[in-house]
Amino acid sequence: MALDGDKSLCTSSTQPLIPVAHIRPLPAGVQTVSPRPEEPSITRPPPSFQASVNRESGARVVVPIAPTYRSPGPSPYSPPPAAPEAKHVEEPPTARPAMEPRNVSSLPGASGPSDLHPYPVPKVAPKPSRSGWTRLKKQLMEEAKEPAFPELKPNLEPMQPEVPAPVVGLQPPASRASRMWDAVLYRMSLAESHRDHPVGPGDRGHPLACLNRLPFLCRPRFNARKLQEVVRPPPTFHPILELHSRPKNFNRTAEGWRLQ
């Protein structure tokens, strides 16, 4: 018997200590005051786990159960409080009224309590939106200037009728083609005037048969070569032969030789 008592003491001393939770019922008044949703109960370990623990320890296992009553203070089992987020969310509406006076004071027409002498805001005239075509026409169009009339001075000299001077310098220079055609027509007029006139020894002009008509242009384009041939001065003909007293010797001799 003594040995059995010693064995029971040894086994009790070697077994680990397990905490035991004592559950007490809550009073009826507390339950009505704080009607909060009950937290889900802690899941109990499976029966296989309890059987293994019973075999090892050979003692009763008591599973702690969280009480349903919550104290006013913070509970270690409760989730983290959401007070910082609520404060952070509620901060913008509290800070907004403080920001609105600044925005109002920054407006040009508003005057804050610190602005004792508000300065007038300069008004800028709106610029008319003009298109590119309108601006281009304004640049290209010249503004009409008022004609400046000369002052009338008393003239003591008798009035003389003003003769308009021939305007020569204002005429544009004639082109080369027009000058060639003028020369051709002039030659034709000379040929018609000297058609019946006999050619004398002093006359150098000779009517050309080709001047009776205009040169025929084979191509529709302007041919300057044919006009140049017509415009060339006519060759001079000497109908009377000049007889010299001593005929010219056309025989040539080399230098250093004499004819005997």
From Swiss-Prot:
Identify the domain of life: Eukaryota
Pfam families in alphabetical order: DUF4643
Q: Where is the composition biased (Pro residues)?
A: 73-83
**GO biological processes:** response to wounding
Q: InterPro entries given for it? A: DUF4643
Q: Where is the stretch described as Disordered?
A: 29-132
* Name this polypeptide is given: Proline-rich protein 33
Q: Which gene encodes it?
A: Prr33
